[in-house]
């Protein structure tokens, strides 16, 4: 009988611990949901900026495109596409030094993309860096 009472008492003493874990779990779930919602919001914002930048680029508003791509890069500095498109826009504005910096970063992020090497070479050629263009 004493053994049963001891087991019951021990079991009852664990209830507050279980409640504490349940509360911590609920807090964790709420925090996770908040982080996910913020990430979705950032992704939607970046997609809108990407569309806006692409439209501006297509309509030859290169300064506007650079602004949009730069905003994307503030949230995601390793976005290859935004870097590459910003570099192209800078090239069209004859900012070849800025374009070379962006192409170089794009190459560091994805060295498999030959187009960044090619376009960086074109910008170096425009700056009369013929050896660097090769």
PLM features: residue spans?
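Alpha-helical tetratricopeptide repeat
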Residues: 2-134
